[in-house]
A protein has these predicted regions:
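A short glycine-rich, Lys/Arg-flanked "PGG" loop and its adjoining helix->strand segment in the class I
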Residues: 115-127
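Conserved beta-strand signature within the Rossmann-like core of class I S-adenosyl-L-methionine
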Residues: 128-133
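Class I SAM-dependent methyltransferase SAM/SAH-binding core
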Residues: 48-90
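A short acidic, Gly/Pro-enriched loop at the edge of an enzyme's catalytic core
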Residues: 89-100
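Conserved class I S-adenosyl-L-methionine
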Residues: 1-36, 38-47
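A short SAM/SAH-binding and catalytic strip from SAM-dependent methyltransferases
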Residues: 99-113
Length: 133
């Protein structure tokens, strides 16, 4: 995972430039249709902050995390919220979120760690919570 984080730290600007304006609202809305207005969402591996900002603009409570220090800086600036630097393996919340949005993020996990992280994600969800990955 360190190589992945190093890559994103070094190429964050190029990644943001190529993805921030991608039209993604149809997929985002499909996720949101299962949530109550104002629900709490974790943007798990938020990258540029594009989706965090979209969800906040739609009235949802959003917490955003990323393992890349550069993405944390960029996303915090773009969204106006305090994005936390955190590895997927460090998720320890219990029944905190109504939805977890893990768009193009947990695919970077080694297979050996995926089951553990999916279990942590399930534990972090409230009853009837949903995940997008």
């Amino acid at each position: 995972m360190d190589d992945t984080l190093q890559y994103y730290d070094q190429h964050a600007k190029a990644y943001v430039d190529s993805t921030r304006d991608v039209e993604f609202s149809q997929t985002q809305e499909r996720f949101l249709q299962y949530l109550e207005p104002g629900a709490r969402i974790l943007d798990f591996g938020c990258g540029s902050g594009r989706d965090t900002k979209y969800f906040r603009n739609r009235g949802f409570q959003v917490e955003a995390v990323d393992g890349s220090a550069e993405f944390v800086r960029i996303a915090s600036e773009y969204t106006g919220i305090n994005v936390r630097r955190m590895l997927f393996q460090d998720l320890d919340e219990v029944e905190r979120y109504d939805g977890i949005w893990a768009c193009s993020s947990i695919l970077h996990l080694p297979c050996a760690e995926l089951e553990v992280v999916l279990g942590k994600m399930a534990r972090a969800l409230r009853r009837r919570g949903i995940v997008y990955t």
